Amino acid sequence: METVDTSQRLARLRELMKERNVDVYLVPSEDSHQSEYIAPCDGRREFISGFSGSAGCAIVSMTKAALSTDGRYFNQASKQLDNNWLLLKRGIESMPTWQEWTAEQLEGGKVVGVDPSLITASDARSLSETIKKSGGSLLGVQENLVDLVWGKDRPCRPSEKVTVHPVEFAGKSFEEKITDLRKELEKKKSAGFVVSMLDEVAWLFNLRGNDIPYNPVFFSYAIITPSTADLYIDEEKLSADVKKHLGDKVSLKPYTSIFEDAKALGQSAQAEVNGGASDPPRKFFISTKASWSLSLALGGANKVEEVRSPISDAKAIKNDTELEGMRACHIRDGAALTKYFAWLENELVNKKTVLNEVEASDKLEEIRSKQKNFVGLSFDTISSSGPNAAVVHYKAERKNCSIIDPEAVYLCDSGAQYLDGTTDTTRTLHFGEPTEKERKAYTLVLKGMIAIDTAIFPKGTTGFSLDTLARQFLWKEGLDYLHGTGHGVGSYLNVHEGPIGIGTRVQYSETPLSVGNVISDEPGYYEDGKFGIRIENIIMAREVKTTFSFGERPWLGFEHVTMTPLCRKLIDPSLLNDAEKKWINEYHSEVWEKTSGYFAEDELTRNWLKRETQPI
């Protein structure tokens, strides 16, 4: 991982701050749609700090600079940040939060500036209150200062064509989705909903794009009222097929006109659906993740209500067509991974081929690309050998990566976008003789993964409540991992999808798991400078039958759809109970049954799969 000298960039930024009377400037990770993964043109935090992880916030004062990120990226950030930066490790008790650190830089009258399009309205309010306690104030700086530093070198905003996502894969027409949304808005007496999250726009209209790497979304907004549906998108993105798909049911408007229209809507919030002058004015809804800019355009708290996005909740519950697509694409994807692992072992062990991490991941993409309905990868493949596996979101760089060591742990976290679903699988392997410590760590992680997979729980249970099931075996040894146990997964959409998840984030305590949720199950363990272990399956929530039904309420469990063998060499059977051994053997039997047919004429892969799926 390369370290970028940020001295000149920071010096220029501070000049711009001084010109605008800004004492501290914030640079969030997100774009104006609050996307986790962003287009290159929106990589402002990476540009100013040199840190390339997907999560974090940069804070720059006139004399100091700090970068806050979570446990997934502590190792990476410590390597990528130069001497200008202080690393704030989020979640570590001895360290201040980035909000607290920002407040510490203030004295009476000092100003904290931020681009209001890159922060949510609720975060802006919370930050403003924190800053006020230190005598400072928060200022929305309309012109992004990092963009000015970046100048002509900043990449252009993508303008890729949008495609129709057919009902045969979506399972529901966009007209039905809009009708359902309107019913929800009417229940809550809303004047309409302004859609700002890119995956929500794509899902609602059954459209897909290519503006953000690995995420089939496109830059857009939408406004849905009881009688209108407006899609804000650049004209050049639209093909004749897309226009025909939308027909006369959707009005197409320029992407940049959203704020002008939002302002007009805010000024006429006494909407047509009021039903009479005696009724209170109806407010427009925006997501709690919508930007401060959008909230201000609509008129702020008097005209706008921030709510849990009804689209996000609906999108997280997959319909039968989407669930069947997830099953099917994971079988094909599992076959691709199996072929890759068999090939990789043969190259490293039998042929003694010298391969680096990128060469290996290139081969995996080549194999995947031949699968039915393949569109592209769902994220940048993590192909990591030895100590690199301890970097949770490691990114092997083509000109600066490691040779794969057959005598070390190899961790591969990868996924693909298929027309019928999105995949995300992690497997940790060893092509030589693993140490006792590596086998123990792997087995403890595996026990945690099985505990989630086999969990049965009453309806209303959250992923927050389930998280300890995955960690319990590591905890008994005084071990842990600094990332979530699971995240929601889209259906040919973002591989990280809210609002569900398994972990300690507050949002995971607010959303009960429901039938139709698709989520990852991925505990891990990492030793910096030595090795990393992670095992990940995708699971789907379903209703299960129990002997009793306390409280006369439904009980839920999971169905796993990932079909890729575990690494038998890393499993220590002495640490497993009979139920866990039974689960592993039944899982491997299922993997063999569902994927071996792909290798009828591929003796190498078939033999590898047969060996890896033998009973333990």
UniProtKB/Swiss-Prot annotation:
It comes from Paracoccidioides brasiliensis (strain Pb03). This is Probable Xaa-Pro aminopeptidase P. GO terms for biological process: proteolysis. Binds 2 manganese ions per subunit. InterPro entries: Creatin/AminoP/Spt16_N, Creatinase/aminopeptidase-like, Creatinase_N, Pept_M24, Pept_M24B, Peptidase_M24_C, Peptidase_M24B_aminopep-P_CS, X-Pro_aminopeptidase_P. GO terms for molecular function: metal ion binding; metalloaminopeptidase activity. Gene3D superfamilies: Creatinase/methionine aminopeptidase superfamily (3.90.230.10), Creatinase/prolidase N-terminal domain (3.40.350.10). The gene is AMPP. One of its GO terms (cellular component) is cytoplasm. It catalyses: Release of any N-terminal amino acid, including proline, that is linked to proline, even from a dipeptide or tripeptide. It comes from the Eukaryota. Mn(2+) 2 binds at D413, D424, E536. Transmembrane segments: none annotated. Belongs to the peptidase M24B family. Its cofactor is Mn(2+). Its EC number is 3.4.11.9. Catalyzes the removal of a penultimate prolyl residue from the N-termini of peptides.
